[in-house]
Amino acid sequence: ENDVLKVGSEDFAYSEYTSEYRNTIDAYMRWGNLVASAGWTYAFSNKLFGKLSGFYTRYRSKIRYKEEDVSGKEGDSGYKYSLDETTNVTGITDFGVRTSFDYRPVAAHRIRFGGDYLIHYFQPEYNRMKALDNSLPDSMQIAKTFSDDKLWAHELAAYAEDDWSISDAFRLNVGLRFSLFNIDNRTYTGIEPRVSMRWLLSPDVSLKASYSRMNQYVHLISNSFMDLPTDSWMPVTNKLKPLVSDQISLGGYYNWNQLLDFSVEGYYKRMNNLLEYKDGYSLIPSSVSWENKMASGEGRAYGVEFMVRKQTGKTTGWVGYALAWADRQFDEINKGRRYPSRYDNRHKLNIVVMHKLSKKVELSAAWTYSSGNYTTLSLENYY
């Protein structure tokens, strides 16, 4: 699937010095995904099931910014023409295989294990720049291409977890995941423990708690405060380390008369080795290597979520509200001071309603409200 977005402007002016002046600005964006997968499931016995799958994904994004200035008419002695054009192309392609197994040795244990292997092909940035001005000599005209090396990476992971029903009231899930990422003669490894538990206080009331650690070797970098598909997938390198996050959560749940489910959950997430563009780099492509545009820092995300859900009767649905905070801290951004993340949406409200008219016909409606994304607007411009 491919999508295209084009925006632009054109200004005209007349003065005593020139018969015509025209300024034209065009911005062009194109992006798309291609996905293919195949899988095979097999029952080894009534206690062991396995699945093998292979997949291919490709993502590409292209941005072009073009500005033209024309003064006078071509052929006249006072004719002036200038052009500034920059084009950026970025993308990632993945090939992979994944195995997963589900083993139930006894009623109290459900063991899941498996692994996956991926080959990543990165094109971090391909920049083409052009600057023409008919008032300057040919030696000062610019038409250059800057391309970062295309990168190949290998990612390997293996995991195992046990869902253990210790009693009718208490359930424990314990898991461990090992990951390995190799790129440009550098290998990173990570251990990711995960544990969650559920305690049934009564038939209608339960508590849940969890902790998890995650290592991420491919960073999603946003270079715009707008919700545009201009984000880039960037790998870890010798300079840039993997993202490491730790998250804890605690929740309470109540079922009222088998009719309504009420829940409240709180969470706290800590992230290290986050990447953001340094101050001064934006949506418009530049000739600076992508690694040198990056700043590394830390972040936090925490909040509380409330939900009411109805799952019986002809009319069902749910209402959810989240009160959340998210911030970032980078030594090279905002003078090292902590600031709200782009995704620091303080309030979020979701309402979903479904109604069955008959066995074959169902109507549904959804409404979402969310606080806007944070951004910083410049106070001064220099030309």
Model-predicted segments: where are they?
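Face-selective signature of the C-terminal outer-membrane beta-barrel domain
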Residues: R30-D184, S263, Q311, W318
